[in-house]
Curated annotation (Swiss-Prot):
Known cofactor(s): pyridoxal 5'-phosphate
Protein name (record): Histidinol-phosphate aminotransferase 2
GO molecular function annotation: histidinol-phosphate transaminase activity; pyridoxal phosphate binding
Annotated region described as Disordered, given as residue ranges: 1-21
Organism expressing this protein natively: Bacillus cereus (strain ATCC 10987 / NRS 248)
Length: 366
């Protein structure tokens, strides 16, 4: 069978190893997964209560327009329901946008170290990918602006950024948007929006009234703790959302997922508590790093990134202690867990860096 030539340069997405897979390599630990930025506290108890009490006819297709969920999102965010598109996770939403907007000869512009699916889907559509290096872990919007040309169809901005956890502030983002042609779509991926505590983080939804070329993406997979249900959504001007709906598969969000997300979106107290505990967890890691002179990027998400050498060694040390983290070529990303889980990982990191210092001293004295 012949497939697109460009597929030969791509690999299927490789998620982090599951606890079951880890046991095959590292023994029968009670593994804690801190690699995929899931909510360690799960979802709102209201979701579990309501799903147990409710009855869904599993022989029927779901509401193809996710009407109740979209209306719930629209009411809370003060937009029109027609401005909301729901997908099976943000992965599908990104695919929908790419399929609708891109063709051979186009290009996208994004950061060099960011969510990989932007690049993945652009290549599938036969597009050039222009990747701009991060500046100290942050999107460099000046350089991204310089990289945009007449063939640029999409600029992807992950804010806060995955995997670094850093963010672009309101002033810089607004200035950037004003300098980009309305012929170029600006997609702002706010998957970690609920975790943000920075006062100067951009409020992007008001920008939609003025700019027809902006899409804002959010998800129920992170703070809302519904990763297994796969629900993400895009918000934009009605005309743009209508065009994207042409590409969206019918019945793409299951009835169960629609109901769970609708219930979860109404539990503000749960999200407030999750953000509070997550902020304390970030402070645990940041305090440890400062005390031990370990580099890190200040995070506005539910993970922290340490730009360190020997990421593989840190991954192995954590794995042998029963913790699954995510290694990268230039560091490690660790999901914030419960206080006890954070303490466990910090203990492993402490031992690793102490051993490293001891080894350096021994080599210097040899």
């Amino acid at each position: 069978m012949q497939v697109k030539d460009q597929l030969s340069s791509l690999q299927p997405y490789k998620p982090g190893k599951s606890p079951e897979q880890m046991k095959e390599v590292y023994g029968d630990h009670a593994f804690v997964k801190l690699a995929s930025n899931e909510n360690p506290f799960g979802c709102s108890p209201r979701v579990l209560d309501e799903l147990q009490k409710s009855w869904l006819d599993h022989a029927l297709y779901p509401d193809g327009g996710a009407t109740t969920l979209r209306q719930t999102i629209a009411n809370k965010l003060q937009v029109q329901m027609e401005q909301v598109l729901c997908g099976s996770g943000l992965d599908e939403v990104i695919q929908i946008i790419s399929r609708a907007a891109l063709k051979a000869g186009d290009n996208i512009v994004t950061a060099g170290a960011t969510f990989p699916q932007y690049r993945h889907h652009a290549i599938i559509e036969g597009c050039e990918v222009k990747e701009v290096p991060l500046n100290n872990g942050v999107y460099d919007l000046d350089e991204i602006s310089s990289a945009v040309n007449n063939n640029t169809k999409i600029v992807w901005i992950c804010n806060p950024n995955n995997p670094t956890g850093t963010y672009v502030n309101d002033r810089k983002l607004t200035q950037f948007i004003e300098g980009i042609s309305e012929n170029t779509l600006i997609v702002i991926d706010e998957a970690y929006y609920e975790y943000v505590t920075a006062k100067d983080f951009p409020e992007t939804l008001p920008l939609l009234e003025k700019h027809k070329n902006i899409l804002v993406l959010r998800t129920f997979s992170k703070a809302y703790g519904l990763a297994s249900f796969r629900v993400g959504y895009a918000i934009g001007q009605e005309e743009l959302i209508e065009k994207l709906n042409v590409v969206r598969l019918p019945f793409n969000v299951s009835s169960l997922a629609q109901k769970a997300a609708t219930i979860a979106f109404g539990d503000d107290e749960f999200i407030e508590e999750i953000v509070r505990v997550n902020t304390e967890g970030l402070q645990q890691y940041e305090s440890f790093c400062k005390e031990n002179d370990i580099p890190f990027y200040p995070s506005q998400t539910n993970f922290i990134f340490l730009p360190v050498e020997n990421a593989g060694e840190i991954y192995e040390a954590c794995a042998h202690a029963g913790f699954i983290i995510r290694p990268f070529p230039n560091g490690v990303r660790i999901t914030v867990g419960t206080r006890e889980q954070n303490e466990g990982v910090i203990s492993v990191l402490q031992q690793h860096f102490e051993n490293k210092k001891r080894k350096s001293r021994d080599e210097a004295n040899a």
